Amino acid sequence: MLDYLGIQYKKKNAVIKWIIEHQNEDGSWGAITERSKGNYRNTLISSEALKMYMSSKHLEKAENWIKTYQGNKWLDPYTQMFLSIKRKDIEIFSPPLFINSVPLKICKSFGKLHVNFPSIFSWSIFLYPSGWTRNALPPLQIIANLKKKSRLGFIKKYLLKRLEDRLLKTQLKNGSWFDTALPTMGTIYALHELGYRNNDVRIVKALKFLDELTDTNGHLNRFRLTVWDTSLAIMAFRESDISDSDIKNCVKFILRAQTKKGGWAFGMYNQNLPDNDDTALATLALRKISGNVQIKGMEGAILRGIKYLLTMQNDDGGWGAFDKNQSYKKPGRIPPYHEEYGHELKDPSTADVTAHVLQTLGENKVYNSEKIIKKATRWLKRDQLSFGGWWGRWGLCYIYGTTQVLSSLSTIGEDMNKSYVKNAIDWLIDIQNDDGGWGEHYSSYYSEKPIIGESTVEQTSWVLISLMECGIDDPKIIEKGMDFLLEKQKGDGSFPKAYTAAAIDPGRYDLYSLVFPLIALSKYKKRCKI
């Protein structure tokens, strides 16, 4: 894209090298960077982007893989956008411009009433007022309409001008849109199509943001989860009894990052779009440390966070990520984009987010919250799958959802002998690997059933934490898991990172291999009174 726009990017060579190095032997690129079979979308876009830079041998292998691919060839609108730069045969799917003018109250009613539109209205999914949708749509709509050679009428020009104004108003202080890479790249492209020059201050700031997201090895991160990571670090420090003075700066950062609405976003700059998961974790971290660290404004921040979460409970009893009553799902996974487009734009209640909110409410002993907690617990029971576990949206995946739910049920004082709780515990125990650890393959995210994989320190830690919190102390289970962690620990105290521990498009969170083993080991140490 930057080549097309004529923009000089100082990390360009590193990015090119990184992409080439991650090509599979068969010529494809996978959904993740390691141990991943070929993915049509990623292979198509990688080969198109690198045609000028790859050797003929590598390019030929990629083209042959694409020609012989027999699977689903559906492309999401952002992939279409990037491909349309060089290919005239690619049309960008985008909804009608009038959708942005539909009153928000009407849009919300579609989600609350669970309206299903006929498939002929494929764009109808964009009526749902998801935080993702609202931020991702305008660049695509602008580019798609300007690339069409048809004449722009008065109404279309007016609607495009409204979208342009919206883009200019929603750029964050760090230069991004939505604090993530894709909407930022899309907006740079849209501004270019609107006639903005590369030296325009808004484009310059956006490019600086992308540069900061790009590692020195050329890997472009989708985002930085500064609030999420810092909250996890606070809880790991607290569990391991790290000096309170070391935690104060972390706490001050979390306090500064709180939005005016009372919630937290995943990054400090995205003040207009707090989410329930980060709000729950930030509030939980502040409460856990409040007995040891007292900073002005801390109690007020906790209360505002709780109040925000209480207002965001869906009518079904659970919590989604960004919105209230935006949509709903059946028990289990959300169908991935390559099976049924549009579901990833929805924001229904999910087990992992609901669990984190419940854990926060339980830890804070919220006054008069019994009705809210019971409503959430009923939803979790409905969402539980036949094998005993839960599907988690923001981690990988069935292990993640199940462990987070069990930890939350323990925190709110649920009876661990109830059958639905025991079924979940039994499932986790049953899938322990012979090496003592736990692991799940990234393809679970796309599967209706869990796909167990090789053990990782992240997933092993999730299970150990939840089992210990549920009162499981069988040495054959817990000690075997702890032995796995200790065997994996390196000389410098760190642990190897899993090839993937997070989801949506499966990704790796580098901090997970530090904070979760630290929490698990610290809990075990306290149990053994070492």
Language model regions located:
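Preference for long, amphipathic alpha-helical scaffolds in soluble/luminal domains
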Residues: 1-530
